[in-house]
Amino acid sequence: MRHFIIVKLKDSSKRRELIAPITELFSASYEIDGVSQVSVHECCTPFENRYDIMIEMVMEERALPVYNDSEMHRTWKRVYGELIEKKAIFGAET
């Protein structure tokens, strides 16, 4: 499955500086059995009404609850949650 986390930051001007630390944090998800790919994308359009960052994960369906309960996921919420205005979570079959 593909798991997408699409984020609109409270301050979009910070998105570029957040890409590297978010990528580093999410690289820990490779330690979860069944996660095969993780990529972090920065929005490339300058419009204010766009989301800023998209995190894409490819995983086996059984890995999703493990990811949700992981320390990495808790760190994501704790460290970056206050910077997020809104987010969309989307799952798709591969």
Which residues does each PLM region occupy?
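Glycine-rich beta-strand-turn "strand-cap" elements at beta-sheet edges
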Residues: 39-51, 77-94
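A generic local structural motif
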Residues: 23-26, 41-43
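Non-catalytic alpha-helical scaffold/packing segments enriched in small hydrophobic residues
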Residues: 4, 21-24
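Short, conserved charged micro-motifs
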Residues: 13-19, 63-67
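Short, well-ordered beta-strand segments in beta-rich or mixed alpha/beta enzyme
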Residues: 2-8, 41-70
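An amphipathic, aromatic/His-enriched active-site/gating alpha helix that lines ligand/cofactor pockets
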Residues: 24, 30-34, 58-90
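Compositionally biased, intrinsically disordered low-complexity regions
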Residues: 7, 12-15, 29, 38
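Residues that form or flank phosphate/diphosphate-binding pockets in enzymes
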Residues: 13-17, 49, 75
